[in-house]
Every structure is written in structure tokens, then in C-alpha cells.
From Swiss-Prot:
Reaction it catalyzes: GTP + H2O = GDP + phosphate + H(+)
PROSITE patterns tied to this protein: G_TR_1 (PS00301), G_TR_2 (PS51722)
Assigned EC number: 3.6.5.3
Span list, region G4: 136-139
Region span, G2: 60-64
Name the record gives this protein: Elongation factor Tu, chloroplastic
Residue span of region G1: 19-26
Annotated residues for binding of GTP: 19-26, 81-85, 136-139
Length: 409
């Protein structure tokens, strides 16, 4: 059977469910896919289809994630749900699923729990921009005042982690009762079941509150250099994949990282042996540069729109250290450890100055499997920005993965 063509009729948004274990994330994901299928947008998935998440490998780390897709009237969504807590942590740090927004699931019967807070903190640190709350298990709360208290507590918790707690929409409901109703009648329409209506309401809220993200083509141009060669009589060509934005022949760009930043002009663009006038995000392209010698440019530098990115040596990051079973280290390490930081296309040696645990306590020793904050100083400046992902490597193998939380220097 021929594959269906993916048609881009609606804007695409990446979303995920986050929250404490057993508060109903996977049940909600199943209820959403079935409710949207009932409205005519996609194919419903049952709980078991989502819960048996396939393993994915991202930067050498195995993560169980389930991706489902569905459509609302306004958008096409790709939705990620991770079964295990450790998978969430790894997923968010490695960016296996970069979320444009998240649905935070909180049980109305229990209120915010430790992992609720951990996921909110993580969402903040890895740059999930917007959150909508689903207050689940409403059917288990007899007292309306109790539900209001839980709602206040959720808003307060969000405020503590610098999300706009007062503005964030909170939709109460019961994922389980909605899912049961949808399983009995997969073609249910709005107005037939109050619990299913709450799922429709949740998705209308997500449509309205989570903005359509700026796509990579609209951002300032950036391409990490993968290879460099010279063409006699024409000059130097840098090849790589355009990470974001677009570039045209004749435009001025900067070469950033590893050495002094230099400015040059794009004199030609080539892809698959054909010349282009313009290259956009996602293209694998050769960029011909005016007045640049082959020795002036190397793998690990980036070509970028002037002023859009600067080289740095010091940053803080949120990092997950692989366990022995995941192919990571067998032994702990200490402050002063000097691994390689693999950023975009190159390894740069860096020294880990300090560590802090997740609850912000200073610590001296880091064990495989830990999640920590660290401050790093690289021996060479490279183009770094907040929210950028990297791998930590030692002797060619990945021992950790991280995301830049802040630039220090």
C-alpha cells in the first residue's frame, strides 16, 4: 500500500504531556486522540497502543517515547508521551521531543506532587515556552472547594518556577471517564457526554493559548560547518546543513567560533551539484565564501547572520549523565573533570567547574544516572546560545547529554 502523503494544510505544533506518575498522562493522551478522531482529525489510539512505547535512540541514549498525531480544527499536532519518569527527564534534556507547549496533568484528588514540580522545573530549564493544565480525576473529588484549593496550589507552583500562574488556563475533567465514553461510542459528538466535552474544551484551550511557534525558516540564518574545501579559481566552500533561517547569494554573513569572528560575502550556493539563489532551513548546502582561505575556516565554526550569535566559553547547563547500562561511565567524576563537549559538529574540551544537584545543593561528586546543573568552561570559544543541546563525550563515547541554561561569559 502506498504511503499517504503528508499534507500541510494546517500549522504544525509539537506538544507533550508532563506530570507526576499515575496522574493520568497516558490516559489523557489516549482520550485526546480518540476525541479528535471523533471530530474527524486523525486516528484514535487506545491506551495500550501508547503505553507500549517504542525505544528511541537520541545522542546515544535510549528513551521510550510514544509519538501520536491528531488534528484539531485549527492545527496538526504531534504529541509525545513518555511512560517512565526517567524517560521524561532524558527526553526533555536531549531534545528527542522539542515541545512548543505542554499539557501538565495534575490529579485533582492529590494536587501537585514531587514529579509535578520536577517536570515544571525541567520544562522551564529546557525552554518549553507554554503550559496548559489539565486537572484530572475531577470525578474523584466530591467537594468543589477542594478542587479550587488544588487549582490555587497548581497556580502557586507554576508561579514559583516563573510560569505565569495566574494566566495559565486550567481545565478540569476526567481522562478515564472520557476515554470510557469514547471507547463505547467512537463517533461521539460535542454535547453528548460531559466528560468528552471537557477533552474538546481542553484542546480548544490548547489551540487558543499555545501560540504557533516561529518556524526555523523565519529565524536568523545559521549553518554549522561540517566540511571545507577549496575550488581552484572560485574560492573556499563550506558545507553543512542549514539549521535555521535562509541565506541568499550576495548576502553578508559571519564566521563564528574557535577563532576571531570574521565577516564575508556569500558568492555562491550549491546543492546536489546545482546552483541556488537561496538556501533555507533543512538544506544540505555548499556555501562559496569570498576572500576566505581554506585554512581560515574549519568544522565546528558556524556561518550566521551578522550579530545573531556570539562565541562564548562559559555557560551553565542542565545535564543527564548516562548510566553504565546506557553505555556511560562506570565510575563517578568530580569537579575539574575535563571531557569533550560535542556541540553541533565538533568536540571542544571543557572543564566542569562546579556541580549542583537538582534541588540546588552544591555537590562534589556525580554518579552515572544523575541529573545535575553544571558550570562549564571551554578551552576555545564557540557559538553557543541558551536552549542549545550538546553531548558530553569521553574517548569517543557519549557519557552525558545537556542543554544550555544560561551563558556566563
Amino acid at each position: 500500500m502506498a504511503r499517504q502523503k503528508f499534507e500541510r494544510k494546517k500549522p504544525h505544533v509539537n506538544i507533550g504531556t508532563i506530570g507526576h506518575v499515575d496522574h493520568g498522562k497516558t490516559t489523557l493522551t489516549a482520550a485526546i486522540t480518540m476525541a479528535m478522531a471523533a471530530r474527524g482529525g486523525g486516528k484514535g489510539k487506545k491506551y495500550d497502543d501508547i503505553d507500549s512505547a517504542p525505544e528511541e535512540k537520541q545522542r546515544g541514549i535510549t528513551i521510550n517515547t510514544a509519538h501520536v498525531e491528531y488534528e484539531t480544527e485549527k492545527r496538526h499536532y504531534a504529541h509525545v508521551d513518555c511512560p517512565g519518569h526517567a524517560d521524561y527527564v532524558k527526553n526533555m534534556i536531549t531534545g528527542a521531543a522539542q515541545m512548543d507547549g505542554a499539557i501538565l496533568v495534575v490529579s485533582g484528588a492529590d494536587g501537585p506532587m514531587p514529579q509535578t514540580k520536577e517536570h515544571i522545573l525541567l520544562a522551564k530549564q529546557v525552554g518549553v515556552p507554554n503550559v496548559v493544565v489539565f486537572l484530572n480525576k475531577e470525578d474523584q473529588v466530591d467537594d468543589a472547594e477542594l478542587l479550587e484549593l488544588v487549582e490555587l496550589e497548581v497556580r502557586e507552583t507554576l508561579d514559583n518556577y516563573e510560569f505565569p500562574g495566574d494566566e495559565i488556563p486550567i481545565v478540569p475533567g476526567s481522562a478515564l471517564l472520557a476515554l470510557q465514553a469514547l471507547s463505547e461510542n467512537p463517533e461521539i459528538t460535542p454535547g453528548q457526554n460531559p466528560w468528552v466535552d471537557k477533552i474538546f474544551k481542553l484542546m480548544d484551550t490548547v489551540d487558543a493559548y499555545i501560540p504557533t511557534p516561529e518556524r526555523d525558516t523565519e529565524k536568523p540564518f545559521l549553518m554549522a560547518v561540517e566540511d571545507v574545501f577549496s575550488i581552484t579559481g572560485r574560492g573556499t566552500v563550506a558545507t553543512g546543513r542549514v539549521e535555521r533561517g535562509s541565506v541568499k547569494v550576495g548576502e553578508t554573513i559571519e564566521i563564528v567560533g574557535l577563532r576571531e569572528t570574521r565577516t564575508t560575502t556569500v558568492t555562491g550556493l550549491e546543492m546536489f551539484q546545482k546552483t541556488l539563489e537561496e538556501s533555507v532551513a533543512g538544506d544540505n548546502v555548499g556555501v562559496l565564501l569570498r576572500g576566505i582561505q581554506k585554512i581560515d575556516i574549519q568544522r565546528g565554526m558556524v556561518l550566521a547572520k551578522p550579530g545573531s550569535i556570539t562565541p562564548h566559553t562559559k555557560f551553565t547547563a542542565q545535564v543527564y549523565i548516562l548510566t553504565r547500562d546506557e553505555g556511560g561511565r562506570h565510575t563517578p567524576f568530580f569537579a575539574g573533570y575535563r571531557p569533550q563537549f560535542y556541540v553541533r559538529t565538533t568536540d571542544v574540551t571543557g572543564k566542569i567547574e562546579t556541580f549542583r544537584t537538582d534541588d540546588d545543593q552544591p555537590t562534589q561528586m556525580v554518579m552515572p544516572g544523575d541529573r545535575i546543573k553544571m558550570e562549564v568552561e571551554l578551552i576555545q570559544p564557540i557559538a553557543i546560545e541558551k536552549g542549545m543541546r550538546f553531548a558530553i563525550r569521553e574517548g569517543g563515547r557519549t557519557v552525558g547529554a545537556g542543554v544550555v541554561s544560561a551563558i556566563v561569559l
